[in-house]
């Protein structure tokens, strides 16, 4: 499974929201993510992709859309 599909699946599993048609929509403004959901999302991303997401790397503006989450994962995998 590619990163995009996996991120969509993670968000759907955690928040019961299909974001495949809203890849650039702000997930906080859309009510998909909140502070607690962000923690759940980070933990799941770390487990599934075997990466560590430093708190300093996870700013709301940097990871607020599905596409930005995907880009962040790719960046951390290549670090």
Swiss-Prot record:
Domain Carrier intervals = 1-77
Specify the pathway.
Cell wall biogenesis; lipoteichoic acid biosynthesis
Molecular-function GO term, any one: D-alanyl carrier activity
Post-translation changes: 4'-phosphopantetheine is transferred from CoA to a specific serine of apo-DCP.
The family this protein is said to belong to: Belongs to the DltC family.
Q: What is the lineage of its organism?
A: Bacteria, Bacillati, Bacillota, Bacilli, Lactobacillales
Q: Which InterPro entries match?
A: ACP-like_sf (IPR036736), DltC (IPR003230), PP-bd_ACP (IPR009081)
Q: Which source organism?
A: Streptococcus pneumoniae serotype 4 (strain ATCC BAA-334 / TIGR4)
Disulphide bonds in the chain? none
* GO biological-process terms attached to the record: cell wall organization; lipoteichoic acid biosynthetic process
What does the UniProt record say this protein does? Carrier protein involved in the D-alanylation of lipoteichoic acid (LTA). The loading of thioester-linked D-alanine onto DltC is catalyzed by D-alanine--D-alanyl carrier protein ligase DltA. The DltC-carried D-alanyl group is further transferred to cell membrane phosphatidylglycerol (PG) by forming an ester bond, probably catalyzed by DltD. D-alanylation of LTA plays an important role in modulating the properties of the cell wall in Gram-positive bacteria, influencing the net charge of the cell wall.
* Keywords carried by this UniProt record: Cell wall biogenesis/degradation, Cytoplasm, Phosphopantetheine, Phosphoprotein
Spell out the protein name for this chain: D-alanyl carrier protein
Kindly list the positions at which O-(pantetheine 4'-phosphoryl)serine occurs in this protein: 35
- Where it mainly occurs, coarsely classed, is cytoplasm
The record's annotation in Pfam families points to:
PP-binding (PF00550)
